[in-house]
UniProtKB/Swiss-Prot annotation:
Protein name: Mitochondrial acidic protein mam33
Annotated compartments: Cytoplasm; Mitochondrion matrix
Family membership noted in the UniProt record: Belongs to the MAM33 family.
Keyword Mitochondrion: yes
Keywords: Cytoplasm, Mitochondrion, Transit peptide
Lineage: Eukaryota, Fungi, Dikarya, Ascomycota, Taphrinomycotina
GO biological process: cytosolic ribosome assembly; mitochondrial ribosome assembly
Main location: cytoplasm
Length: 269
């Protein structure tokens, strides 16, 4: 995709950016822009094609929904392999939230993802878009944004929260983005109060806002960052798991979209 086009998209997004109030743990950083475009598999093209179908508005809408359902069901979905060993999945139809659980010794591991999270939820208010604004200057110098930021290529992604807790000893929480080739970590938190750190309640969110829970992961010494990645990999929170999360998230999102279309169509009949 042309980098200037990406710039226009994110300038538009930046005007309406907000931080979600429902979860104090989700606050992804600069890698969150990695293709929400590629993440959304829906074209809605069949709806436009059927807009001139004969009949009253309700019949037209039902026909359009049926066309869209057929179109999406014909989309080729890659086979989703089983999750890495020791991980159990909590996946409820109709829910956008998927949870992976595992044990490592006396530790409880919980990885949460929300497949409906969009760009306005994934990009924080303080997101710096200046790196994109230098695109024209780079081109004038005979360079491209791809040369300047070789690791910021567009690719599939799924925001997630990684929780590692020990009963009576607190919890370590990583805000991350699962990519095809591993996890990109943005923030790391620790607290002795597991409920305060991991709960979605308003009371827990209020407590989190008043406490220092940890730094931005990118601000840590590079050696510390590497050691934290090794710590996660020892618990099988690695490239294999991140690739699975990305693929599972895409498939889950498509299935929920189809279920939604079918439910609306049934309501209209």
């Amino acid at each position: 995709m042309n980098s200037l086009r990406v710039l226009k998209i994110f300038r538009s997004v930046s005007r309406s950016i907000r931080i979600p109030a429902s979860n104090g743990c989700i606050n992804l950083g600069r890698n969150a822009y990695r293709v929400q475009l590629a993440k959304a598999p829906f074209s809605f093209s069949s709806i436009r094609r059927s807009s001139h179908t004969a009949g009253n508005p309700r019949s037209k809408l039902i026909n359009a929904l049926s066309s869209e359902i057929d179109y999406e069901k014909n989309q080729v979905l890659s086979e989703i392999s089983l999750p890495p060993v020791n991980y159990d999945i909590e996946d409820v139809q109709g829910s956008a939230v998927v949870v992976l659980k595992a044990k490592h010794g006396d530790e409880n591991i919980r990885i949460t993802m929300n497949v409906s999270q969009d760009v306005t939820d994934a990009v924080p208010e303080e997101q710096d878009f200046t790196e994109f604004e230098d695109e024209q200057e780079l081109q004038n110098q005979g360079e491209s944004a791809e040369d300047e930021f070789p690791n910021e290529d567009l690719g599939r992604f799924q925001p997630c929260t990684i929780e590692i807790s020990k009963p009576g000893n607190g919890a370590l929480v990583f805000e991350a983005t699962a990519l095809d080739d591993g996890f990109d970590i943005e923030n790391i938190y620790f607290s002795k109060d597991i409920d305060m750190l991991t709960s979605d309640s308003l009371e827990a969110e209020w407590k989190r806002r008043k406490q220092y829970l940890g730094p931005s992961f990118k601000e840590l010494d590079p050696e510390l960052q590497d050691l934290f990645h090794s710590y996660l990999e020892e618990r099988k929170i690695d490239e294999s798991l991140s690739s699975f999360i990305v693929s599972f998230g895409l498939t889950k999102e498509l299935k929920e979209y189809i279920n939604w279309l079918e439910s609306v169509r049934q309501f209209l009949k």
